[in-house]
Amino acid sequence: MSFETPDFSLALPEIWLLAATCGVLVVDLFSSDPRRSATFYLTQGALLVTAVLALSTQWGVNEVTFSGHYMADSLGAVVKASVALLSVLALAYTRPYLGDRGLLQGEFYLLALFANLGMLVIASGGSLLSLYLGLELLSLALYALVAYHRDSRQAAEAAMKYFVLGSLASGILLYGMSMVYGATASLELSVIAEVAGRHSDPLMLLFGVVFMLVGVAFKLGAAPFHAWVPDVYQGAPTPVTLFLSTAPKVAAVALFMRLLVDGLGPMHEQLEPMLMILAVASLLVGNLIAIVQTNFKRMLAYSAIAHAGFIMVGFTAGTDAGHAAALFYTIAYSIMAAGAFGMITVLARSGFEAEEIADLRGLNERHPVYAGVLLLVLVSMTGIPGTVGFYAKYLVLQAAVEAGHIPLAIFAVVAAVVGAFYYLRVLKVVYFDRPEAEVDADTLPAPGASSAIRSLVVVNGVAVLVLGIFPERLIALCQAALGL
């Protein structure tokens, strides 16, 4: 019997983040600072180092270790770096909000670190086992984060819904994995792909793939498995919603790629009709229901469902170009979502959450910088030419057309036009509606945090603007990660 010695150097990002999380836990345990400065800066530093390690140790590599359970490649490197950097951006918005409400505890940052560890494991998952373990580590941390505000009935209700539906989706995914294992006699994605190409025991394999697709679609928030998204986005504390709408989206796309592309790519022909249904349903449900929303967070939740539909359009193409477009779309959307939800955290104060669209009345008169950033973000989400959102939609649609899915591409364009209505409605409120006196007093930035937050808002807006003017670097990075 031969024993393969694992190459621990390939798993350096995960090893570092686990060690750093333990270090942050110890430091926070002995910290008496109510602002948790050491915990915050150590968390941000750990995530930045993780991004550097991911790109430096795994870019251009294509190796499998830990008996096939761990895969080090360029796709994993890009996903890990994106997840870590998006988490840094999301967590930077949270500190004033949490401090203003007496919620600034070390547990928030520790849960975010454990969630990142789960996302890193997903990004390099080389088997069904490692992917499921990474997913559960991520999910458990997110369940706890949604319930982080213990005194909020809304947060408790959202957490319960998320936990129950998430557990059901995880069970369905696990059942699908068990059927795939039964049909292929292996947990390794490379072996599963080889067997799937030969169509061994196709009926059991196909049923397993359907269950797995349902589980992954739930994690991505695609219709008709989207029931948790509006309630969780609205009920969770805004910093948690901000985090939930950024890095975990990239991890969900990575899970999709590992399971249904690396593992079950040869079965794309059978998957194609199901992927198309998910894309159409998400575009339809997300855009139509978002139109009637008055709560800004809930509107953005349905917007996220619609964006998941565009991501599914990229996967429906079934080509490397389509997969690269889906990855680029997810990263671009996450940056835009950080700006949108970040704006809510900036404008909110204790006793006033700034969650209603009406709360944004006359924002341009009170805070023109914030209004300008929100304009950039929402115009980009709409997909106006010259923005990063336009390039994201263009690449996805191009991949769909090249794959012969012209009716699907036309439907996606029509859905995007419909979706423009609710984004422009918010901008109309921001720029043309008069502010109410009582709202004007409440929506000032949190005391002592205005300069730091203003800088962060500007950085987020500049990132959206620069990626819209110069998208080539990020597009090339995503394409190189897929071997293009």
UniProtKB/Swiss-Prot annotation:
Mind telling me which residue stretches traverse the membrane in this protein? Answer: 10-30, 40-60, 74-94, 108-128, 129-149, 163-183, 203-223, 237-257, 272-292, 299-319, 327-347, 370-390, 404-424
Q: Which GO cellular component terms are attached?
A: plasma membrane
Per UniProt, which keywords does this protein have? Cell inner membrane, Cell membrane, Membrane, NAD, Quinone, Translocase, Transmembrane, Transmembrane helix, Transport, Ubiquinone
- Might you give the EC number(s) for this enzyme? 7.1.1.-
Q: Where in the cell is it found?
A: Cell inner membrane
* Reactions mediated catalytically: a quinone + NADH + 5 H(+)(in) = a quinol + NAD(+) + 4 H(+)(out)
Give one GO biological process term: ATP synthesis coupled electron transport
Single GO term (MF): NADH:ubiquinone reductase (non-electrogenic) activity
**Topology of this chain in the membrane:** Multi-pass membrane protein
Q: What is its main location?
A: membrane
Signal sequence, start to end? none
Assembly:
NDH-1 is composed of 14 different subunits. Subunits NuoA, H, J, K, L, M, N constitute the membrane sector of the complex.
What does it do? NDH-1 shuttles electrons from NADH, via FMN and iron-sulfur (Fe-S) centers, to quinones in the respiratory chain. The immediate electron acceptor for the enzyme in this species is believed to be ubiquinone. Couples the redox reaction to proton translocation (for every two electrons transferred, four hydrogen ions are translocated across the cytoplasmic membrane), and thus conserves the redox energy in a proton gradient.
What NCBIfam families has UniProt attached to this entry?
A: NDH_I_N (TIGR01770), PRK05777.1-5 (NF004442)
Family note: Belongs to the complex I subunit 2 family.
Q: Which HAMAP family match?
A: NDH1_NuoN_1
Q: What is this protein called?
A: NADH-quinone oxidoreductase subunit N
**Taxonomic classification:** Bacteria, Pseudomonadati, Pseudomonadota, Gammaproteobacteria, Chromatiales
Gene for this chain: nuoN
